[in-house]
From Swiss-Prot:
CDD domains xref list: Ribosomal_uS17 (cd00364)
GO cellular component term of the entry, any: cytosolic small ribosomal subunit
Quaternary structure and interacting proteins, as annotated: Part of the 30S ribosomal subunit.
GO molecular function: rRNA binding; structural constituent of ribosome
Record keyword Metal-binding present: no
Domain of life the protein comes from: Bacteria
The keyword Ribonucleoprotein is assigned to this record: yes
Organism: Rhizobium leguminosarum bv. trifolii (strain WSM2304)
Pfam families the UniProt entry points to: Ribosomal_S17
Record family assignment: Belongs to the universal ribosomal protein uS17 family.
Protein name per UniProt: Small ribosomal subunit protein uS17
Its job: One of the primary rRNA binding proteins, it binds specifically to the 5'-end of 16S ribosomal RNA.
Keywords per UniProt: Ribonucleoprotein, Ribosomal protein, RNA-binding, rRNA-binding
Length: 79
């Protein structure tokens, strides 16, 4: 099974080797057909502490690293 890859924005970088990434999804409301935005935060592994708040990054699923970390940052998009 392929690993999922998501794009999001770094919203927290205070933890050692960890960043918090907010991933936003958009969908049409089933009744109103209005576009709705929902977001979710993921803790992702950042080995070199190189990503800062506001960076747009791609994260990839991985084996559990800790209690909450199951994602790894694989690259940064253009700011």
């Amino acid at each position: 099974m392929p690993k999922r890859i998501l794009q999001g924005v770094v919203v927290g970088d205070k933890n050692e080797k960890t960043v918090v990434v907010r991933v936003e999804r958009r969908f049409a409301h089933p009744l109103l057909q209005k576009t709705v935005r929902r977001s979710k935060k993921y803790k992702a592994h950042d080995e070199n502490n190189q990503y800062k708040i506001g960076d747009t990054v791609s994260i990839e699923e991985c084996a559990p690293i800790s209690k909450d970390k199951r994602w790894t940052v694989i690259s940064a998009q253009g700011q």
